[in-house]
Amino acid sequence: MSGGFQPAANPSIVQTQAARVPGRAHVLVIGNEKGGSGKSTTALHIAVALIGEGSRVATLDLDARQGTLSRYIENRAAYAQRKGIELPMPRHAAVALSTLPDRGAAEADETARFEAALAPALATADFVIVDTPGSDTHLSRTAHVWADTLLTPLNDSFIDLDLLARIDPDTLKIVRPSIYAEAVWKQRQLRAIQGGRPVDWVVMRNRLSSLAARNKRDMGNVIEALAKRVGFRVAAGLSERVIYKELFLSGLTLLDLKRGGGGPSLTLSHVAARQEVRDLVTALNLPPPAPFAPEAAPATEASTPVPPPAG
């Protein structure tokens, strides 16, 4: 752990609502340096929920090699075409890793790719949802600097929590923040240097069991303590349900089941799960859509974005 990392000494760094930067979309980055935390599922459910509220939504997949979010959206488009129905669709783009052998050149190439995909989304959407890979990559770090809201899905396991903090096994006290918490802090610092507004970091407890197990209670206590030390908000995520895996092949979300079209029948369990999605969107406390400035670049122009000015 580098000596430069410091906990959030000022409580004001934890925002109750991330401020919208005038004239551009609000960027929601879904980040966690561990695969299998439900980032892509969460991304599409939030996107569909926001579209249902009347917002214009763009999605970016930075894990183009695995491409879970991209395939999810492809499956969705194919399902709608097969069934002859209309489904809410975000404007989607995938950003591939550079193949250049030189590291510096590759990172510059990836930055350019990311900015080219981000620019039209910033200019034409109300929200840009960025799905990041479950590993530390240059693309992921670049996206984190742009986050107005950072959402970190966290499986209810001390294995997953280890990315945020080292925990004493006997006392369950926080020994020190861990690799991802440090990475987020560094990106916060870089954003501040570039004149960006404070990031609203939200950690969602994902795949919660319905059982009142001791592990669940201990996790809750540790996460609440860590939130105060590192500087994030805690939100209830999505419970562990088979339906999420079943919906992937059709590209559907729980919010689509009421639309018909041959999808799974709606059960009481699905109704409860759908409410979890809505509760999550509410907990994010995203800013309302705002009119774009007249000088905003049209979607067809690949103007290079610059970090937002301090507000």
Predicted features and spans:
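Conserved beta-strand scaffold positions in the cores of enzyme catalytic domains, especially
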Residues: V27, T59, P90-A94, W201-V203, ...
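Walker A (P-loop) phosphate-binding motif
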Residues: Q17-E53
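Short, well-ordered alpha-helices that flank and scaffold nucleotide-derived cofactor binding pockets
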Residues: L44, V48-G52, E74, V145, ...
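Short, flexible helix/strand-to-coil boundary loops that buttress conserved ligand/catalytic motifs
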Residues: I73, L163, F248
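Generic structural signal for small/hydrophobic residues in well-ordered secondary structure
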Residues: G35, T68-L69, D148, L238
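Conserved catalytic-core segment of NTP-binding enzymes
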Residues: E53, P133-A236
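C-terminal lobe/tail of nucleotide-utilizing enzymes
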Residues: M1-P22, A192-G311
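P-loop/Walker-type NTP enzyme "switch/lid" segment
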Residues: G31-K34, A49-V128, G134, P169, ...
